[in-house]
């Protein structure tokens, strides 16, 4: 599979309106994923501003594999100075520019500057294609890095593009399918994991027990929204390749861990973004899934004071299982201020024994997100 295949797939994905998104079976999962990205961006901005001399600091951002520009509003809220948006899918990139232009027209005091670059970041030198040549403070790559792991050269080229123009002390952040979790899920289900909203099938059953570091193809479908071959990006390998590029790990958190980490400070935004489904449903609303998808939420509500008509935020079991298949990460380029230097703690992938790792995966498989 080539980058052209990925571009053709995402170019063909229909742009959905607000009404269509609200009716989606994965409405809450989508919102929760968006909230996760918002919190990740917020944490990176806090680290950048903590070390900045000028507390009115406005970062220069590279949005790598920006798609249709779904994070443009997040960058507006983040008060960025400028942004370069790059993607291999030309139709998606055009839609991102249209979205930016519409936002700019509505802004009374102007919007951040933006450049849109059509590039195959697995092959091209992105820096040479930019009209502007900024040193970026922040590079963001959301749900896309793993496509480059089709082979070693593509992965190395993509990561070089992600880090080459990042200033010392700047951050690379992103979201990524959790290769360890995916391999566990397909092994436990004879090569294919499937529930009401997603399916994951590993391409070559014969190599499931020992997938290759590059070119480990799997097929992921989420509510019929994504059905393009993807590739496992084993996080310790990602970390190793980035360390060769003078990057150091700040944190890696699997989505359930990240949700727990941000849930308290980000509770208001989580509620406004409707990232969790109210249970029991309010005002005669219907649940987004069958009642048996909320067994853990039902049992948890029973432990609360019934006189107060308690309600919690949760996800259906199927959405939660899909949510658990991702992780977030942040790397920092060496040099610059040490104010945001990473902790010396190892990631769970580095420190867990096989027994501990298996127990954690089993616990997450049955866990429900509640607040």
Q: What are the residue ranges of the model-derived segments?
A:
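Class I SAM-dependent methyltransferase Rossmann-like catalytic core
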Residues: 2-55
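Conserved class I S-adenosyl-L-methionine
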Residues: 56-67, 84
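Class I SAM-dependent methyltransferase SAM/SAH-binding core
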Residues: 70-124
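A short acidic, Gly/Pro-enriched loop at the edge of an enzyme's catalytic core
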Residues: 127-139
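A short SAM/SAH-binding and catalytic strip from SAM-dependent methyltransferases
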Residues: 136-154
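A short glycine-rich, Lys/Arg-flanked "PGG" loop and its adjoining helix->strand segment in the class I
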Residues: 154-168
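Conserved beta-strand signature within the Rossmann-like core of class I S-adenosyl-L-methionine
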Residues: 168-177
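C-terminal lobe and adjacent flexible extensions of AdoMet/dcAdoMet transferase-like proteins
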Residues: 187, 193-196, 205-371
């Amino acid at each position: 599979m080539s980058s052209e295949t990925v571009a053709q797939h995402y170019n063909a994905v229909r742009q959905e309106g607000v009404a269509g998104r609200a009716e989606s079976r994965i409405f809450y999962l989508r919102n929760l994923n968006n909230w996760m990205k918002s919190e990740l961006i917020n944490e990176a901005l806090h680290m950048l501003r903590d070390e900045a001399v000028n507390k009115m600091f406005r970062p220069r951002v590279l949005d790598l594999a920006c798609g249709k520009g779904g994070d443009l509003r997040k960058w507006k809220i983040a008060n960025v100075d400028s942004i370069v948006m790059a993607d291999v899918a030309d139709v998606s990139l055009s839609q991102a520019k249209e979205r930016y232009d519409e936002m700019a027209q509505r802004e009374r005091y102007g919007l951040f500057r933006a450049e849109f670059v059509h590039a195959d970041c697995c092959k091209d030198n992105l820096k040479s294609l930019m009209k502007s040549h900024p040193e970026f403070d922040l590079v963001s790559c959301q749900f896309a890095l793993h496509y480059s792991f089709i082979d070693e050269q593509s992965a190395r080229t993509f990561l070089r593009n992600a880090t080459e123009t990042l200033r010392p002390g700047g951050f690379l952040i992103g979201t990524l399918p959790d290769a360890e979790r995916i391999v566990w899920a397909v092994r436990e289900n004879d090569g294919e994991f499937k529930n009401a909203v997603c399916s994951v099938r590993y391409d070559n059953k014969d190599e499931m027990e020992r997938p290759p570091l590059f070119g480990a193809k799997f097929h992921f479908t989420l509510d019929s929204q994504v059905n393009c071959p993807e590739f496992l990006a084993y996080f310790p390998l990602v970390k190793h390749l980035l360390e060769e590029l003078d990057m150091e790990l700040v944190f890696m958190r699997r989505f359930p861990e990240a949700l727990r980490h941000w849930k308290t400070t980000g509770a208001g935004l989580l509620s406004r973004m409707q990232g969790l489904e109210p249970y029991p449903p309010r005002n005669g609303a219907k649940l987004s899934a069958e009642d048996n998808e909320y067994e853990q939420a039902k049992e948890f509500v029973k432990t609360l004071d019934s006189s107060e008509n308690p309600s919690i935020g949760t996800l259906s079991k199927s959405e939660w299982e899909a949510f658990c298949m991702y992780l977030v990460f942040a790397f920092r380029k060496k040099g610059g201020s040490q104010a945001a230097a990473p902790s010396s703690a190892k990631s769970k992938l580095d420190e867990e024994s096989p027994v501990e790792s298996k127990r954690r995966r089993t616990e997450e498989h049955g866990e429900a997100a509640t607040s």
